[in-house]
Amino acid sequence: MSDSVGGCIRPRTAVSEAEVEALVHGICFKTGPPRLLGVEVEWLVHELRAPRLPVSPDRLQAVYTALRAVPLRSALTVEPGGQLELSSLPAASLMECVRTVSADLDAVRAVLREDGLALVGLGHDPWHEPRRFLRQPRYDAMETCLDRTGPAGRFMMCTSASVQVCVDAGQEEPGPLGYVRRWWLAHQLGAVLVAAFANSPLAGDRPTGWRSTRQLRWAQIGAERAGGPRLDSDPRGAWTRHVLDAPVMCVRNDGGPWDVPEGMTFREWTRNLAPRPPTREDLDYHLTTLFPPVRPRGH
């Protein structure tokens, strides 16, 4: 089995459980003086003058094609339900980050406005039911996996949006700038940030009983996919165990569906080697399918 990268064929090499432990332990908490920060902002896209009307997939496709020609400093991507996301470059200060993303948002809004569309900064769509815009194997597999716990996964994929803050892990040494302290502090701030950004009390045009219906959806998805490891004095070890013991969402297959045995963890995959042996690329992909409140990304 091989990967085709830039026209070159690269053999896939299986990874063992011990190799996975070493890789996750070594790459997910890169330490050093905390200097840079970034932000990822997701937006719902609605009709400018009639936001209760759904935007057709053809219109979304046309406006996203137009946006590809707009020079932006942030990376522009599209979420499964057609939500728009801007991911900033690493910035040396908060003001630099805000200025850059604000300028990009102005440019994006101008293009959308020409087509009668607008960005809406809500955590959950108050009117529309989930509807997939992107038809890709990754999202087919994600939908199948999340459907096992109920409808919340489809709402999360297609009708939710968020603000995600990216910061350096911190120094190896203990103290207020150490990564252990910053990891703990990020988790403590989670509830505060959820409350501060809570602006989505409706779904289907009815109150859900939550100020943040987006947070409700994550709670309904469950801790295996949307939870994090237990906080202790060894974040690297705790995160490594969490990654290995989390269910695999999908096994990529160039010639067919990405289905996976229900409940199979990555640890079990490294031991059973079925439906095929896992590779480093599979590990990297598995890391992108875990959605804890705080995720170490190797920054």
Regions found by a protein language model. Give the residues of each.
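Short aromatic/hydrophobic contact patches that present stacked aromatics
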Residues: 85, 164-166
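Loop-rich catalytic cores of soluble enzymes, especially ATP-dependent carboxylate-amine ligases
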Residues: 123-149, 156-157, 166-295
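Terminal catalytic/cofactor-binding subdomain
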Residues: 1-153, 159, 184, 198
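Substrate-recognition/cap regions that form aromatic- and gly/pro-loop-enriched pockets
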Residues: 299
